[in-house]
Swiss-Prot record:
Biased composition (Low complexity): 63-74
Region (Disordered) residue spans: 53-90
Name of the protein described by the UniProt record: Uncharacterized 10.2 kDa protein
Length: 90
């Protein structure tokens, strides 16, 4: 279920992915939607730099632990062409 491009994510990045994937799959019942939402959650904390995932400088500004809903937008980055962008509410 983890997209190929995310296999070298740090441990905490993978935890974020799986947490959001599981939550989104239960809520929406779609694996495709769950992957898109989970990738967006990861992108709030990590960015891909020369093939390596790095913590974003503003990573602490994004809360990926909250269970409350807020409208956020995931934007596409140049370095993740095989990971689709998504618009979502988490």
């Amino acid at each position: 279920m983890l997209p190929e491009k995310l296999h070298n994510l740090p441990h905490n990045g993978k935890r974020i992915f799986y947490k959001f994937y599981d939550r989104s799959l239960r809520k929406f019942g779609s694996r495709e939607v769950a992957v898109k939402l989970a990738v967006c959650a990861v992108r709030k904390k990590y960015t891909l730099v020369r093939g390596q995932w790095r913590a974003r400088p503003d990573a602490n500004d994004a809360d990926t632990t909250s269970s409350s809903s807020s409208s956020e937008t995931c934007t596409e980055s140049d370095d993740s062409s095989d990971v689709p962008p998504a618009r979502y509410a988490v």
